Amino acid sequence: MQDPNADTEWNDILRKKGILPSKEDLKDLEKEAEEEEQRILQQSIVKTYEDMTLEELEDNEDEFNEEDERAIEMYRQQRLAEWKATQLKNKFGEVLEISGKDYVQEVTKAGEGLWVILHLYKQGIPLCALINQHLSALARKFPDVKFIKAISTTCIPSYPDRNLPTVFVYLEGDIKAQFIGPLVFGGMNLTLDELEWKLSESGAIKTSLEENPKKPVEDVLLSAVRCSVPAKRDSDSEDD
């Protein structure tokens, strides 16, 4: 097959007839074809990046040119942000059961900037069961906080049952708040929102509740008194 780029008399005739493109047009076509090839190649490289893990990107870093590295760095930051978000979301999310031998590792050495909420409980105490139920819901809602529970006497031998339930709030191994005994929690009327608010006051969780869902005792008593006293009739007022 004859080369259409060759400077032959026959090719010149074909160019004049418009059958072959001019040399200038041919160069433009070749340039466009080369640019298209580079574009397709670049898309293929980017797609390869998307299939790589962060570790694979690190391993193949020496094979990338300067333009590749800029594209990869942007993609790397995106993947890293997604990974961090996933790690945070899935960090805890449930209440972990521990015993006394796990205390130092799970509480004292829990980690920098990490809040830990520990519930000391015993089986057969209804309020302890209720708080465990509420803590499970809060653990799912606040997965960046470490919620743990332990049978009281496995952590503190001879710990009196009258002090149960007990909740300790820690930050970096230091106690920031403690709630001891049923009266602190308001008994079996304790709601999930009330417990969330109580824990948020210690700083352990960032609640979206705008106000304390539990009415002050004074307000409750005052409302009860008002409801129990009948309103005076107009005739009674006139007699006075």
UniProtKB/Swiss-Prot annotation:
Keywords: Acetylation, Angiogenesis, Apoptosis, Chaperone, Cytoplasm, Endoplasmic reticulum, Phosphoprotein. N-terminal methionine acetylation destabilizes the protein. GO terms for biological process: angiogenesis; apoptotic process; positive regulation of gene expression; protein folding. It is found in: Cytoplasm; Cytoplasm, Perinuclear region; Endoplasmic reticulum. Residues 92-240 are annotated as: Thioredoxin fold. The keyword Acetylation applies. The modification N-acetylmethionine is found at residue 1. Gene3D superfamilies: Glutaredoxin. Its main location: cytoplasm. The modification Phosphoserine is found at residues 44, 235, 237. InterPro entries: Phosducin-like_chap/apop_reg, Phosducin_thioredoxin-like_dom, Thioredoxin-like_sf. The keyword Transmembrane helix does not apply. It comes from the Eukaryota. GO terms for cellular component: cytoplasm; endoplasmic reticulum; perinuclear region of cytoplasm. Pfam families: Phosducin (PF02114). Acts as a chaperone for the angiogenic VEGF receptor KDR/VEGFR2, increasing its abundance by inhibiting its ubiquitination and degradation. Inhibits the folding activity of the chaperonin-containing T-complex (CCT) which leads to inhibition of cytoskeletal actin folding. Acts as a chaperone during heat shock alongside HSP90 and HSP40/70 chaperone complexes. Modulates the activation of caspases during apoptosis. NCBIfam families: phd_fam. Belongs to the phosducin family. Interacts (via thioredoxin fold region) with KDR/VEGFR2 (via juxtamembrane domain). Forms ternary complexes with the chaperonin CCT complex and actin substrate, leading to inhibition of actin folding. Interacts with XIAP (via BIR 3 and RING domain). Interacts with HSP90AA1 and HSP90AB1. This is Phosducin-like protein 3. It comes from Bos taurus. The lineage of its organism: Eukaryota, Metazoa, Chordata, Craniata, Vertebrata.
